[in-house]
């Protein structure tokens, strides 16, 4: 019993000490880069619209979009709507809507909201867009899409065959956009966006069965047999994470409050990862996938880490902080960091970087500790069991990162001026896996389905994925399926290539310290 309590409280103490060290390193690391210090923290508030207008730094912007941005307009189905007063009340986050000002949101609005028709029922447009405005925006979208395809070819290191490359000569933007709107409407008609109570109850029963088997194995197996109980504990966390992910997308129940409660249970209580924190950051991950801004750095919070650089375009945001010297060894450190400190890192991060205080987060943390005390007290080897479980959870981290880490990065302003579907397709890949193992990926092996249609219930991903592949092939876009092991190898190779550039082109003395 004492060992269990020591383990749990050591983790909490380690959390506080670790955070103190990180804060100290950042505080005493000298004058940081202007660009790096401008990168918003996870608790920072979004800029006012007036500041956001000035922050746009794109080499080529659309004049129509810039005028509409200044007026606080968005384009939906050919009509301009004024959202300037609504921006700061946007449930999905202030910055999410700010970054789409002036853009055509016809597709992204539909797929990001479960009830788009109801939302727009009583909203009146300011005016219809003129043919000249529509043509200018379409022309800019086409330009951005072709630039993204070119960047994909130039900067991808994991392309195994020419079939994986975009074919710009096959791409026609208007036909592409019509096909994807039609596909969305087909999925709606088929009921693929409706949550299933039966599916939820079944998966929750499986989850409870896993942790029950872990406890039973602790009682039945010899005291020295800690691998199976630990693996089952890790699998419990692993699958809890996927259900938290579904809940925080509001894909498990028809009621948003109930989804938030389920996210709290599966995430904060079962997994130990703050569900509300995940929801806030994950919304931005979908809206800002693999993007950055020349002035403020990373825009996709879930693809940012201070200890490694995934893409050469991100090098200017690294170099002068002490912790950045680790990027010189990122190809070596990546897997050890994921496996050794991955679980503790995300538990700490989700608790201490929550954007606003929520009492139920503290309650969830207490429930998590009590639950795991009850579980780990059933074995005489709680520490090895916990360690094995943490190692298993590292697989979850690799699964979540592998879908995007080797894919291209774009300036956010350019990305939002382009086509949402093209952007998501070029920044994503699927995992190729046998049918029997799909459950281990939480459905996210079908990642194109998830990123193109975030509110789609994952029980239908196996149906929607072939339809998406067909449209990608028709329009000359890559649809990449890669084995999990090959993906991990690709990430390590990518880190090795990027760190070479960082060593020669990085900013600040840290970049050259170990070259």
Curated annotation (Swiss-Prot):
PROSITE patterns: CYTOCHROME_B5_1, CYTOCHROME_B5_2. CDD domains: Delta6-FADS-like (cd03506). Pathway: Lipid metabolism; sphingolipid metabolism. A motif (Histidine box-3) lies at residues 447-451. The keyword NADP does not apply. It is a multi-pass membrane protein. GO terms for molecular function: heme binding; metal ion binding; oxidoreductase activity, acting on paired donors, with oxidation of a pair of donors resulting in the reduction of molecular oxygen to two molecules of water. Pfam families: Cyt-b5, FA_desaturase. Its main location: membrane. This is Sphingolipid 10-desaturase. It comes from Thalassiosira pseudonana (Marine diatom). The lineage of its organism: Eukaryota, Sar, Stramenopiles, Ochrophyta, Bacillariophyta.
């Amino acid at each position: 019993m004492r060992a269990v309590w020591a383990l749990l409280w050591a983790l909490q103490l380690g959390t506080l000490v670790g955070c103190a060290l990180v804060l100290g390193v950042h505080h005493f690391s000298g004058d940081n880069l202007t660009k790096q210090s401008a990168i918003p923290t996870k608790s920072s508030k979004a800029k006012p619209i007036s500041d956001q207008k000035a922050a746009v730094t794109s080499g080529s912007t659309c004049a129509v979009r810039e005028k509409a941005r200044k007026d606080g307009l968005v384009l939906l189905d050919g009509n301009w709507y004024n959202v300037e007063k609504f921006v700061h009340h946007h449930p999905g986050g202030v910055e999410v809507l700010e970054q789409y000002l002036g853009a055509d949101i016809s597709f992204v609005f539909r797929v990001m909201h479960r009830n788009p028709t109801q939302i727009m029922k009583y909203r009146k447009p300011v005016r219809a867009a003129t043919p000249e405005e529509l043509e200018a925006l379409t022309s800019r979208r086409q330009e951005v899409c072709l630039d993204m395809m070119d960047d994909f070819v130039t900067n991808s290191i994991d392309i195994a065959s020419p079939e994986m490359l975009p074919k710009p000569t096959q791409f026609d933007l208007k036909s592409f956009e019509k096909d994807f709107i039609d596909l969305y409407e087909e999925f709606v008609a088929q009921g693929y966006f409706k949550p299933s109570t039966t599916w939820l109850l079944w998966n929750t029963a499986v989850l409870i069965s896993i942790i029950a088997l872990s406890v039973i194995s602790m009682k039945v197996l010899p005291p020295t047999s800690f691998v199976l109980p630990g693996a089952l504990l890790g699998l419990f966390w692993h699958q809890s994470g996927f259900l938290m992910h579904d809940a925080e997308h509001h894909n498990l129940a028809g009621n948003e409050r109930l989804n938030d409660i389920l996210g709290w249970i599966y995430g904060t209580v079962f997994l130990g990862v703050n569900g509300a924190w995940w929801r806030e950051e994950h919304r931005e991950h979908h809206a800002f996938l693999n993007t950055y801004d020349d002035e403020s750095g990373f825009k996709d919070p879930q693809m940012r880490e201070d200890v490694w650089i995934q893409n050469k375009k991100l090098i200017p945001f690294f170099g002068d902080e002490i912790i950045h010297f680790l990027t010189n060894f990122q190809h070596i450190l990546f897997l050890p960091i994921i496996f050794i400190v991955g679980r503790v890192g995300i538990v700490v991060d989700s608790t201490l970087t929550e954007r606003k205080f929520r009492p139920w987060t503290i309650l969830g943390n207490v429930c998590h500790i009590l639950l795991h005390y009850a579980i780990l007290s059933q074995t005489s080897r709680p520490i090895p069991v916990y360690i094995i479980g943490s190692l298993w959870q590292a697989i979850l981290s690799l699964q979540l990162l592998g879908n995007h880490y080797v894919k291209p990065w774009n300036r956010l302003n350019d990305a939002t001026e382009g086509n949402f579907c093209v952007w998501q397709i070029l920044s994503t890949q699927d995992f190729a896996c046998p049918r029997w193992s799909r459950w281990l990926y939480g459905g996210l092996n079908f990642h194109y389905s998830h990123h193109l249609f975030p509110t789609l219930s994952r029980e239908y991903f196996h149906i929607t994925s072939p339809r998406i592949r067909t449209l990608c092939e028709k329009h000359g876009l890559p649809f990449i399926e890669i084995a999990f092991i090959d993906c991990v190898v690709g990430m390590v190779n990518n880190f090795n290539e990027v760190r070479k550039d960082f060593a020669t082109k990085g900013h600040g003395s840290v970049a050259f310290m170990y070259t």
